[in-house]
């Protein structure tokens, strides 16, 4: 069972920047890393006119595209899948880094905060699954450890320790 750790926070808090830097650090250390990202707005990996797009437009509910070094599966679903359903799709990995899903998922989470966004509510005070805060400033009354948002190696150490 891979170690699963979430990076949660509000928009523009630096979640993607920190999580990708931690992914790079863990990969450098030899871990096999996977990532799951929550997109609040619709997204599309296809481009109009491309073959995979044409299959989807023709009604295919699942399309796999393969090249020499990667593959991707596009799935149309009537309902949004749960985070647990998505996590179950990963295989052959040591660590799964999850971005978003602050109100979903039975996994430990690191809140990402920046001074520029300090007016946002503190998730670490509202969610028991938040086990650390990665930030660029100190806050009073923090109930969990504070990690330096600009030190991905230290955040990676924390992830490994969980």
What label would you give each PLM region?
Residues 4:
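Walker A (P-loop) ATP-phosphate-binding motif of ABC ATPase nucleotide-binding domains
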Residues 7:
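Hydrophobic anchor at the beta1->P-loop junction of P-loop NTPases
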Residues 12:
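Walker A (P-loop) phosphate-binding loop of P-loop NTPases
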Residues 15:
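Conserved lysine of the Walker
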Residues 21-84:
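N-terminal phosphate/diphosphate-binding loop that engages ATP/GTP or pyrophosphate donors
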Residues 74-104:
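Phosphate-binding/switch loop-helix module in NTP-utilizing enzymes
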Residues 95-162:
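Phosphate/Mg2+-binding loops and adjacent switch elements
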């Amino acid at each position: 069972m891979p170690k699963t750790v979430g990076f949660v926070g509000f928009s523009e808090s630096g979640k993607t920047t920190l999580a990708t830097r931690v992914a790079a650090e863990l990969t450098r250390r030899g871990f096999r890393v996977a990532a799951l990202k929550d997109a609040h707005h619709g997204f599309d990996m296809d481009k109009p006119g491309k073959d995979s797009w044409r299959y989807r437009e023709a009604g295919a509910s699942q399309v796999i595209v393969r090249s020499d070094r990667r593959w991707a599966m596009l799935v149309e679903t009537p309902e949004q899948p749960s985070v647990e359903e998505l996590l179950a799709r990963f295989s052959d990995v040591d660590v799964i880094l999850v971005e978003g899903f602050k109100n979903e998922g039975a996994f430990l989470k690191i809140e990402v905060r920046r001074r520029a966004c300090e007016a946002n509510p503190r998730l670490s005070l509202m969610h028991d699954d938040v086990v650390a805060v990665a930030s660029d400033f100190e806050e009073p009354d923090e109930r969990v450890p504070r990690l330096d948002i600009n030190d991905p190696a230290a955040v990676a150490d924390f992830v490994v320790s969980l």
